[in-house]
């Protein structure tokens, strides 16, 4: 999980979602693409 000031999709499979008021990126193809804004 990377924590970044601005998150964006890295590949086509990445999905931008909101959980508990936080913007996150989850990816089904590559778990290294997981990101959280903060």
Curated annotation (Swiss-Prot):
Top-rank lineage group of the source organism: Bacteria
GO MF annotation: an example: structural constituent of ribosome
GO cellular component, one term: ribonucleoprotein complex
InterPro entries noted in UniProt: Ribosomal_bL36, Ribosomal_bL36_sp
PROSITE patterns: RIBOSOMAL_L36 (PS00828)
PANTHER family per the UniProt record, alphabetical: 50S RIBOSOMAL PROTEIN L36, CHLOROPLASTIC, LARGE RIBOSOMAL SUBUNIT PROTEIN BL36C
Family of this protein: Belongs to the bacterial ribosomal protein bL36 family.
UniProt name for this protein: Large ribosomal subunit protein bL36
Organism of this sequence: Synechococcus sp. (strain JA-2-3B'a(2-13)) (Cyanobacteria bacterium Yellowstone B-Prime)
Source species taxonomy: Bacteria, Bacillati, Cyanobacteriota, Cyanophyceae, Synechococcales
Gene of this entry: rpmJ
